[in-house]
C-alpha cells in the first residue's frame, strides 16, 4: 500500500528517486500513466494488470469508456527502476503533469501519484477545507 507524501526532485535527465517505502513494491517494474487532475499515476505491474482487466470489462459501445481507456492507456509507459531506485519519467508525461524540478510523490493506497510540488500544494489547500467539513457518507469510503 502506498502512503504518505514525499518530496523528491526531478534530475536533469528526467528521473526521480522513488521513495524508499515504495521501492520494494515497484522494484520489478511499474507503469506510469496520465492521472486525473494533471498528475502521473504510478502503478505496480500487478496493480496495473488488475486495473486493465477492469477496463476490459467496460462495454465497447460506451463512448465514455472508450475515451477514458484511450487517454489512460495511450499515455502509459512501463519502466523498471535502476539499482539506486531511480525511474525516468517520459517527456510527454512530464509535460502533461507540468512537472518542474520540485515534486510531490503521494501515496494513494493502490497507487502513487507524482505531482509538481506547487500544483500539489495548491490542490491540497483547495481540497483540505472540503475534506475537514465532510460529514455526508462518501460511497465506498465513509
From Swiss-Prot:
One CC-aspect GO term: cytoplasm
Superkingdom per UniProt: Bacteria
Predominant place of localization: cytoplasm
TM region positions: none
Keyword Repeat tagged: yes
Oligomer and partners: Forms oligomers.
CDD domains found in the cross-reference section: MraZ_C (cd16321), MraZ_N (cd16320)
Family: Belongs to the MraZ family.
Location of the protein in the cell: Cytoplasm, Nucleoid
GO molecular function: DNA-binding transcription factor activity; transcription cis-regulatory region binding
This protein's name: Transcriptional regulator MraZ
Record keyword Glycosyltransferase present: no
UniProt domain SpoVT-AbrB: residue ranges: 5-47, 76-119
UniProt-listed InterPro entries: MraZ, MraZ_C, MraZ_dom, MraZ_N, MraZ_sf, SpoVT-AbrB_dom, SpoVT-AbrB_sf
Keywords: Cytoplasm, DNA-binding, Repeat, Transcription, Transcription regulation
One GO BP annotation of this record: negative regulation of DNA-templated transcription initiation
A Pfam family: MraZ
Amino acid at each position: 500500500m502506498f502512503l504518505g507524501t514525499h518530496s523528491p526532485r526531478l534530475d536533469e535527465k528526467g528521473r526521480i528517486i522513488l521513495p524508499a517505502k515504495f521501492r520494494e513494491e515497484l522494484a520489478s517494474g511499474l507503469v506510469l500513466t496520465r492521472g486525473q487532475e494533471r498528475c502521473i499515476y504510478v502503478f505496480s505491474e500487478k496493480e496495473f494488470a488488475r486495473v486493465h482487466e477492469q477496463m476490459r470489462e467496460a462495454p465497447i459501445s460506451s463512448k465514455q469508456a472508450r475515451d477514458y481507456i484511450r487517454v489512460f492507456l495511450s499515455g502509459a509507459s512501463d519502466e523498471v527502476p535502476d539499482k539506486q531506485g531511480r525511474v525516468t519519467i517520459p517527456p510527454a508525461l512530464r509535460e502533461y503533469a507540468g512537472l518542474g524540478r520540485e515534486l510531490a510523490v503521494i501515496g494513494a493506497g493502490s497507487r502513487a501519484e507524482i505531482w509538481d510540488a506547487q500544483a500539489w500544494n495548491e490542490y491540497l489547500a483547495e481540497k483540505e477545507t472540503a475534506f475537514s467539513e465532510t460529514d455526508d457518507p462518501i460511497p465506498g469510503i465513509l
